[in-house]
Amino acid sequence: MPQSSRYSDEHVEQLLSEMVNVLEKHHAPTDLALMVLGNMVTNLINTSIAPAQRQILARSFAEALQASIKKADKAH
């Protein structure tokens, strides 16, 4: 999603691969996978971000998600 990151592509891809493997291991359909990932994002925001910043971060995350979907739609 972000244009630049302090994390290496390799590290991001490794975590992504491991998370996909867990979802596949549990044969999670798309709706369940999205629900679990959404709950994970909510938990991270609520436990790791100061209350005053939560809405701003959630909005920014949602905008980045929408932008990445639009970008993927144009590529197909």
UniProtKB/Swiss-Prot annotation:
Transmembrane segments: none annotated. InterPro entries: UPF0352, YejL_sf. Gene3D superfamilies: YejL-like. Pfam families: DUF1414. Belongs to the UPF0352 family. This is UPF0352 protein ECA2748. It comes from Pectobacterium atrosepticum (strain SCRI 1043 / ATCC BAA-672) (Erwinia carotovora subsp. atroseptica).
